[in-house]
Amino acid sequence: QRQMCIRDSSSSVDLTSNEPWIVARNTAVILLLYGCGLRISEALSIKYNDMPLTNNLKVKGKGDKFRIIPILQIARESVENYLKLLPFTLDGNDNIFRGVRGGSLNPRSIQLIMKLLREKLGLASNATPHSLRHSFATHLLTSGADLRSIQELLGHTSLSTTQIYTSVDSAHLMDVYSKTHPKAKSKNSLN
């Protein structure tokens, strides 16, 4: 499976509509899924009360537990751009992401957008909105983040759940081992 990166996700979502606000919405949602590791339900439940965004985002996760996560500047700017273009008026407790008729955006819409992205980018059939969350976790781990921090960012109660998300290749594990284990640094000497 080819993992998506921020470049793929931000430059490719415009294939789904000619309406600028819909293009902006799709871009913002995809960037939140990948750039913040959000579940689709978490992204779609962001409230107008939470605006304007700062460098952090308060997310209501599973079990109605809240967590604070950092938000990438590109994701924040995408949400702000979407809100400027949105043709509907929002009240404080409204979800910010809206469907074509102004109601709350249905998760199925995002799944369909991902289907179009898969076709355009030649991604594997298992490239789904949820796989963006997996890519987020895997990219953090391969860039040096520790599992415990990734667990907090994803909102997992169990570290074993986080481990499932972080598909680590054996070459990366051996590299980390050889660079960090004191005896591995000294040419596998046990002295």
Where are these regions (language model features)?
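Conserved catalytic core of the tyrosine transesterase superfamily
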Residues: 3, 7-191
